[in-house]
Regions:
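ATP-dependent carbohydrate kinase catalytic cores
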Residues: 66, 91-122, 216-245, 250
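Active-site nucleophile and cofactor-binding loops and adjacent substrate-binding regions
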Residues: 34, 74-76, 93-100, 119-122, ...
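ATP-binding/phosphotransfer module of carbohydrate and carboxylate kinases, centering on a glycine-rich
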Residues: 1-53, 169-333
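Short, acidic Gly/Pro/Ser/Thr-rich loop/turn segments
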Residues: 12, 64-66, 135-139, 194, ...
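Short glycine-aspartate micro-motif
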Residues: 2-6, 54-58, 93-95, 119, ...
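Short beta-strand-loop/turn "lid" adjacent to the catalytic site in phosphate-handling enzymes
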Residues: 48-94, 99, 103-112, 129, ...
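Short coil/turn connectors at secondary-structure junctions
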Residues: 54, 89-90, 123-127, 136, ...
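Glycine-rich phosphate-binding loop of actin/hexokinase-like ATP-binding domains
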Residues: 114-184, 189, 276-278, 284-297
Length: 333
């Protein structure tokens, strides 16, 4: 049995898999709020109760990983492969969550994707993965024989680059608050809430009472804003989502240029699949608006990842590899 985990800033997912004929077969799964636990051990201790056939474990974590240890950017506890191995007595791997997602792409089927731009995939070209949720994750997908090999990064924390006068004002506002302003400050769930407050101030329009109530009830403006934008019930919410999608597309284009991702760009995370009508409307135009390289970017395929099990599947695949070489103490794929 293989233990796979996806540890994000909001949710912690665990699953048990078996490998049959080279294919991963899921046997059991659970999802928890990450904040419920002080350590990863607290989470998988109950989940694994009575399970005595474990062969290996692998976890994707939202944050940088060094020497098998992750200090999650939006996760309160650290995760160490050596500690997991000592605890469970099996090979253990800890990797960045975007790396896990990158490995998981090969486990998906065509129905797990929504095509934003069909383009012309270069069979020898690199790819790129960008994922917006609680944070903004980015990975480069190096092309090797047999598919992509993901290289994790923390590109979401690179400096935000405004494209027009309004976004310069946005940068000024956020710089007063945070000092350094990263792309994650504007392209993420918390970033969506930030953009909404900026757009509300910019518009000069008062917030409708019904919207104030819904935001207070939800405790988070982001899902309320996206729902109102989809329903076209508030113009400021619509402008907020338009800017969010445009910024998301712009940074995806930046990543595509850095990776020379002629093999395709994959858009992950929870925000894009839940807002597909809005993403279809403005993502590609911002993605390809790169001056002299607009033609190159226009030929790059773009797909939204619809399957939220991608990271778990990637972790399970790496766990299967670790189980096949048990003599090693696994800390990286």
């Amino acid at each position: 049995m293989l233990l796979a985990g996806d540890v994000g800033g909001t949710n912690l997912r665990l699953a048990l898999f078996e490998e049959e004929g080279g294919k991963l077969v899921e046997r059991r799964r659970a999802r928890f709020a990450t904040r419920e636990f002080a350590t990863l051990h607290d989470a998988f201790d109950g989940f694994l109760a009575g399970e005595r056939r474990l062969e290996a474990a692998a976890f994707g974590v939202a944050g940088p990983v060094r020497h098998g240890r992750a200090e999650g950017t939006n996760v309160a506890f650290s995760i160490d492969a050596a500690e997991i191995r000592a605890d469970l007595g099996v090979p253990a791997v800890v990797m960045n969550d975007l790396e896990a997602n990158g490995w998981g792409l090969a486990e998906l089927t065509p129905s797990d994707f929504e095509v934003l731009n069909r383009g012309e995939a270069d069979p020898l070209g690199n790819g790129a993965l960008i994922s917006a949720g609680t944070g903004l994750g980015e990975a480069i997908l190096f092309r090797e024989a047999g598919g992509f090999v993901p290289m994790p990064s923390e590109g979401g924390h690179a400096s935000f680059a405004p494209r027009n006068d309004e976004e310069i004002e946005l940068l000024k506002t956020l710089r007063l608050r945070h000092g350094h302003v990263s792309w994650e400050r504007v392209v993420s769930g918390p970033g969506l809430s930030t953009l909404y407050r900026f757009e509300r101030t910019l518009s000069g329009l008062p917030e409708p009472e019904w919207l104030t109530r819904e935001v207070a009830s939800a405790g988070d403006a982001a899902p309320v804003v996206s729902r109102a934008a989809l329903a076209e019930t508030d113009p400021v919410c619509q402008r907020t989502m338009h800017r969010f999608v445009s910024l998301f597309g712009a940074e995806a284009g930046n990543l595509a240029l850095k990776a020379l991702a002629t093999g395709g760009v994959f858009v992950g995370g929870g925000i894009a699949p839940r807002n597909l009508p809005l993403v279809r409307d403005g993502f590609f135009s911002a993605f390809s608006a790169k001056g002299r390289f607009a033609t190159l970017l226009a030929r790059i395929p773009i797909k939204v990842v619809l399957n939220d099990s991608c990271a778990i599947l990637g972790a399970a695949r790496i766990a299967a590899r670790a189980a096949a070489r048990p003599a090693r103490t696994e800390v990286t794929p």
